[in-house]
A protein has these predicted regions:
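N-terminal, positively charged nucleic-acid-binding surface of large information/translation enzymes
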Residues: 1-139
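Structured secondary-structure scaffolds
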Residues: 1-5, 52, 57-61, 112-326, ...
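N-terminal alpha-helical segment
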Residues: 10, 264, 294, 348-352
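A glycine-rich phosphate-binding loop feature that marks nucleotide/adenosyl-phosphate handling sites
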Residues: 10, 83-88, 249-251, 300, ...
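Short acidic/His/Gly/Ser-rich catalytic and metal-binding motifs that mark active-site loops
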Residues: 10-14, 254, 292-293, 313, ...
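Short alpha-helical functional segments enriched in proximate histidine and acidic residues
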Residues: 39, 65-68, 72, 131, ...
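Helix-rich, typically C-terminal accessory recognition domains appended to large enzymatic cores
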Residues: 77, 300-338, 345-400
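Short, glycine- and charge-enriched coil/turn segments that flank and shape catalytic ligand pockets
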Residues: 99-100, 134-136, 176, 199-210, ...
Length: 400
């Protein structure tokens, strides 16, 4: 297993925030990347590679890929005029706007006109649809696959702007340096540059070993970029596609998204101070369903910790250890003895690992956790049914 994560560090939004903070863009992203890595460490989250899109190797490969796509006719220079959302780093047509605002984040858009290089997405639309049809698990969950096909691919793909001239914080197009490579090629390509892809074919061993990736695990709000733009770019570069792209749902606060303006953002370090790392990790995994958005509030978190971790798991561990220390000197005198309640528990214990594994293979983490806690609840019930404290005093049933 090779697990890679990292930070997308270029773009107009970062350039503007760095200016507002009176810092250079590089100093600004260095600081932010440090904070993000600190959060991974805080949450005991391990990874094999933390890639930054300001890494020199990544920048060099992006320039080489851009030039290769241009030279083979997949990219051409033209001019773009439309509406631009800085927050989403995306262009939109008039008809795509929602009540005059960004259709994705609801934020403000402004009229933009600039020279740009464009990627001919439409040249690969039929090939992409064919790939999706022949690989039914390529986009998951199923509802998101249908959304991508029916809402974006089949209506027709517009050519994609892949360079910008209105800001400077980006990777320069080496043969036309007034342009910087836009996020679609810059950020998305980190998945292959991070494991040693080389546009000239001199790949590192890690790329040969780990690509194509078994899984891209991403937020549902960026699924379009990872299931349309990214696969088409790989097709154009003659690189195998990842085996699956999974768009996970959001964790909502109450019924709405977290928003700094609403003051409802829940921060990981605050949660760790309140509940501890392991409890927070459990909460994040359990409250994130497979397809629907999850809901997280402080009341839900307290209730979940009390009911699951304290009453079910904690109670089982406490009762088991206490009775082990109290009775028979902690020794099982006859492991083969059984009673009327044993077989049901044995069957459940034997079947649970496969159920957990099957659910994890399909990324149904919440269901896997529920499988485990079904077993824990049955163990607690077994203790109530068999009453070891009574058996220990009954000489005839002492082996039980």
């Amino acid at each position: 297993v090779y697990f890679m994560t990292g930070t997308d560090e270029h773009g107009q939004k970062i350039e503007e925030k760095a200016l507002a903070a009176n810092k250079t863009p590089q100093a600004f992203v260095d600081e932010v990347a440090g904070v993000i890595r600190g959060l991974f460490d805080l949450m005991n989250t391990s990874y094999d590679k933390f890639i930054r899109t300001t890494d020199p190797y990544h920048e060099l490969q992006v320039q080489k890929m851009f030039k290769k796509l241009y030279e083979q006719g997949d990219i051409y220079k033209s001019e773009y005029e439309g509406w631009y959302c800085t927050a989403c780093e995306s262009f939109y047509t008039e008809t795509q706007l929602k009540d005059g605002a960004c259709p994705d984040c609801g934020g403000p858009v402004h009229k933009a006109k600039e020279e740009s290089y464009f990627f001919k997405l439409s040249n690969y639309a039929d090939r992409l649809i064919k790939h999706i049809e022949e690989h039914p698990d390529f986009i998951q969950p199923e509802s998101r696959k249908n959304e991508m096909i029916n809402n974006f691919i089949k209506p027709g793909l517009q050519d994609l702007a892949v360079s910008r001239t209105s800001f400077k914080w980006g990777i320069p197009v080496d043969f036309d340096p007034k342009h910087v490579v836009y996020v679609w090629i810059d950020a998305l390509s980190n998945y292959i540059t991070g494991i040693g892809y080389d546009a000239d074919g001199n790949h590192e061993e890690r790329f040969k070993e780990f690509w194509p990736a078994d899984l891209h695990l991403i937020g549902k709000d960026i699924l379009r970029f990872h299931t349309i733009y990214w696969p088409i770019m790989l097709m154009a570069l003659d690189i195998p596609l990842p085996k699956q792209v999974f768009g996970h749902p959001w964790l909502l606060v109450g019924e709405g998204k977290m928003s700094k303006s609403k003051g409802n953002v829940i921060y990981a370090d605050d949660l760790v101070k309140l509940f501890g790392v392991d409890a927070v990790r459990y909460l994040m995994l359990h409250e994130m369903p497979f397809a629907q958005d999850g809901t997280l509030t402080y009341d839900i978190m307290v209730e979940r910790i009390n009911s699951d971790l304290a009453n079910i798991l904690g109670n089982l561990v406490n009762r088991t250890l206490a009775m082990t220390n109290k009775y028979n000197g902690g020794i099982v005198t006859n492991a083969k003895v059984s009673g009327e309640f044993d077989q049901e528990l044995i069957d459940l214990a034997l079947s649970t690992p496969k159920k957990v594994s099957d659910h994890m293979d399909r990324l149904r983490v919440q269901d896997s956790i529920d499988d485990i806690f079904d077993l824990l609840k049955r163990c607690n019930k077994y203790i109530d049914e068999t009453a070891p404290w009574a058996l220990a005093k009954d000489e005839a049933n002492k082996d039980r």
